[in-house]
Amino acid sequence: MTAPHKVAFPARCAVNICYDKHLCSQVFPAGIPVEGFFEGMVELFDADLKRKGFDGVALPAGSYELHKINGVRLDINKSLDELGVQDGNTLVLVPRVAGESFEPQYESLSTGLAAMGKWLGRDGGDRMFAPVTSLTAAHTAMAIIAMAVGVVLALTLRTRTITDSPVPAAMAGGIGVLLVIGALVVWWGWRERRDLFSGFGWLAVVLLAVAAACAPPGALGAAHALIGLVVVVLGAITIGVATRKRWQTAVVTAVVTVCGILAAVAAVRMFRPVSMQVLAICVLVGLLVLIRMTPTVALWVARVRPPHFGSITGRDLFARRAGMPVDTVAPVSEADADDEDNELTDITARGTAIAASARLVNAVQVGMCVGVSLVLPAAVWGVLTPRQPWAWLALLVAGLTVGLFITQGRGFAAKYQAVALVCGASAAVCAGVLKYALDTPKGVQTGLLWPAIFVAAFAALGLAVALVVPATRFRPIIRLTVEWLEVLAMIALLPAAAALGGLFAWLRH
């Protein structure tokens, strides 16, 4: 025996329509905007009047509007339910006039509160005052765990700087293992709760990295930092591969970029006592190289292969041979093609695969741009040396790098990459101004007035550029000039950085 089918009817509202000396009862849907059926209603009303021998509606259907019986206009963009129209109400069809639309008024507080609650909860929840749910409780618990992890990290690093005991590393590692177990339980039991898995995973990665850095004996130095950074990189990649979320991929890429740069600096410091300024110069040059390589790295991470050249018959025209580079192809002759390979095959990627690859490429580019922008202010801070013999050259290197970062933003079509680069460059400018202000003698003019004027002028220039550039269509000569200025800045940057870092002096001696 089959269960009876359930039929759902839309909410309706029976009202009286008054026009001139005529009155007609009609039933309208109460849950959709009046605009959807208003003109049809006027046409049907006109046809009904003419069928009964009366004069029809004088004006076209779009020249009328609905009023309440007290003369207040109704907004046809809302439904009858939202307007507070109930069964038996009388509405007046009148020519359209200028004025404000009607907002429903309630004679009692309870009726108004009930109507407001119904409107707020029509999409399944209160959109103004969100209640405490299980998701809220879970996120609050993760925040509490993060606070506890922060306390453990601070105490672990403090204790490790005092003593060479393995207890701090064991304590941080033990708590990190517990968080790893929690992440695995969430992964196996609640696979859809990626938020909890990410929370447990990132906290575990931080704790395990600190434990690995504190485990080797000796005073904390570059070697310990290198070990911890490598653990962070491996843990971040693991989380990114497990979650496969777009925003998670961007975060993982940013973390890997920052930690990779810091790990390279730590590796150099392990073997050579390189000065901070030389390391900062190398980092600035490396950041520019990373920005230029961002599209290539993103395509490599997304495994987007070089284009495939084929004919409309399905036979390959070009193919890669054994021993050839991955980005090169060679012509295919008839003797190389087998008969069974001559079938018509569609080798074009499907739209879903192309969209997934595009999202992954975009996420990787966003992460790399954000990571590079986070490192740029620190690198500029390390390059600048106020009141030193080569201070002007350091200022030139930092200024050229910041300018190249700003111009590189126009090479990205998505907004997040460009915004990240521009914000990183602006933060670098503020960091440079702050370093010069802190290094000058304590005084109102040099320590506050001139830095504040410079920062205000830079902000005003940024505002002017933001207002003019997006709304202006520049001529090709202007765009070509900007490109040539960018090339000249790159040409001037490399010798200046080499001279500032002592490369020419090292080669001469």
UniProtKB/Swiss-Prot annotation:
KW Nucleotide-binding (keyword) present: no
This protein's name: ESX-2 secretion system protein eccD2
Any matching Pfam family: YukD
Lineage: superkingdom: Bacteria
Transmembrane segments: 135-155, 170-190, 196-216, 222-242, 248-268, 281-301, 364-384, 389-409, 418-438, 449-469, 487-507
Membrane protein topology class: Multi-pass membrane protein
Species in which this protein is naturally found: Mycobacterium tuberculosis (strain CDC 1551 / Oshkosh)
Quaternary assembly: Part of the ESX-2 / type VII secretion system (T7SS), which is composed of cytosolic and membrane components.
Record-stated family: Belongs to the EccD/Snm4 family.
Cellular component, GO annotation: plasma membrane
Cellular localization per UniProt: Cell membrane
Intrachain disulfide bonds: none
Keywords, alphabetical: Cell membrane, Membrane, Transmembrane, Transmembrane helix
Gene3D superfamilies reported in the protein's UniProt record: Phosphatidylinositol 3-kinase Catalytic Subunit, Chain A, domain 1
